[in-house]
Amino acid sequence: MATIHLPPDFKEFLKLLNAQQVEYLLIGGYAVGYYGYPRATADMDLWIGMNPQNAKKIVTILKEFGFDIPDSSIEVFMKPNQIIRMGVTPVMIEMMTTISGVSFEECYPHRVKDELDGVEVNLISLRHLKINKKAFGRHKDLDDLENLP
């Protein structure tokens, strides 16, 4: 696996997710790099499991991370097809509630737990990442597919 360096804000956010036992998966460019095709990425993509406990934990973490958000924001993390963006590239975090081609319930039990830059991370499995990339079908996703093992 490739050596991956994470910006300090990414590391801090991942540590908060882990401390609160949030159900999440690292997807996107960082996952592609982990599986052997390092490439430039403008953000860290996280797929968040949609359930009430997870949603409450995320809102708590966002407040701890310095965002002033109302408790009613919990509802955003309970709706499909949501993308929540924080920060600006290249240190932007995107949290998604749905991704193409796979379900969270199917992927989470098969997650890969590993350490990136000293932080424990839950990654989408290679098989599920490939299914997602194929289903999403953008040019960069198809390029990722060609270069993944």
Question: Can you annotate each of these PLM segments?
Answer:
Residues M1-P149:
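Compositionally biased terminal segments of proteins
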